[in-house]
Amino acid sequence: MFNKKSGPSGRTNKSYKNTSEPLAVQPIVGDGNCLFRALSFAITGDEEQHAVVRSLICDFLESTGHQKAGELRQNKVWGTTTEILAAAEMFQLNVCVWASFGRVHTWHIHKPKGDTATQPVYLENKIGNHFNVVTRV
């Protein structure tokens, strides 16, 4: 279930601090669409399908009554944790995000409701404002 203002509600996601960093990363174009490009690459092998991934996520968010889904349809509007959780739910994926801020290194694992994921997707959140795809953990 998604909260109309902020996104998912009633979810449990896990974080693991100071764990091993990714062994290999696929760089993603940094043009304001990087979350959607990264998800596109992780799912289809082609980051150029980012507009389709963005549209599907927006459709999903609109179906839940999310208030900012229309704004998110614009090219180059950054994706956030809300969109990551929507992707986890609609694609039935565990979206694992590596974040490194100074000396704190954390894997954040975003799961679909009911923990029904069929496969994981690994992303890297670079300094809080860019996403790449982790290709080896």
Task: Report the location of each language-model feature.
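Cysteine-nucleophile protease catalytic domains, especially the papain-like/related folds used
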Residues: R54-A86
